[in-house]
Swiss-Prot record:
Reaction it catalyzes: 2-C-methyl-D-erythritol 4-phosphate + CTP + H(+) = 4-CDP-2-C-methyl-D-erythritol + diphosphate
UniProt GO MF annotations: 2-C-methyl-D-erythritol 4-phosphate cytidylyltransferase activity
InterPro entries per the UniProt record, alphabetical: IspD, IspD/TarI, IspD/TarI_cytidylyltransf_bact, Nucleotide-diphossugar_trans
Pathway the protein acts in: Isoprenoid biosynthesis; isopentenyl diphosphate biosynthesis via DXP pathway; isopentenyl diphosphate from 1-deoxy-D-xylulose 5-phosphate: step 2/6
Gene3D superfamilies per record: Spore Coat Polysaccharide Biosynthesis Protein SpsA, Chain A
Function: Catalyzes the formation of 4-diphosphocytidyl-2-C-methyl-D-erythritol from CTP and 2-C-methyl-D-erythritol 4-phosphate (MEP).
Residues with site note (Transition state stabilizer): 20, 27
Protein name: 2-C-methyl-D-erythritol 4-phosphate cytidylyltransferase
One Pfam family hit: IspD
GO biological process, any: isopentenyl diphosphate biosynthetic process, methylerythritol 4-phosphate pathway
Keywords, alphabetical: Isoprene biosynthesis, Nucleotidyltransferase, Transferase
Amino acid sequence: MISRIQELVAIVPAAGIGARMGAEIPKQYLMLNHQPILAHTLDRLLEHPRIDKVIIALSPEDSHFAKLSQASHPKLMTVIGGKERADSVLSALKVASQSAWALVHDAARPCLSAADIDKLIAACETEEGHQQGAILAMPVRDTMKRSGKGGAIQETVCRENLWHALTPQLFPVISLKQNLADALAAQVAITDEASAMEWAGGQPLLVSGRFDNIKVTHPEDLQLAALYLQAAASDPNSSTGE
């Protein structure tokens, strides 16, 4: 460990509607084990002792957030998000302390463990991680196929050195803000924070995360997330439980 992160702000882009879920309300407000998905996600972040503040980017039309019990938490503040994820993250970065590190986490990943947050922070307190930042990720386990026209298999892709990018992703506020702004100005497709850092020449570290840190995207994911949360709540050694 060469340099302890002194100030850490979590950023949650939550201005999207989650169209693939096909629900009548934004997916982050769907109920999961007696409270909305977003409430679980915020609990994971607000309860972590290393996180000083949580900034959540909301749609200007959001009528659900104020109903959450977490909405009045003293560590939490809100900003107006944008049309795309990167716009929402950038809005939050603009009000964050410029000397802090930003831990950006998906609103629809409610099963994040404190242990994974600890691992990610520890990676960024090493010499290489302090220079490059890091993301939670998971090695690809399944055989990968690339499709051609009509949905037929074009080729099998070697899965060696392939990873699924997860969140949180952790970078210094000042560099992430600059690189995101520059990439958006250049009309670069930014799918996560690491892609903005890569575009600027960075090589963020990959930190192996838990398989249960799933993103709720489709209806069946709700059932799986519920099982993971129930299992964590019944395990006294788990750092995900309520």
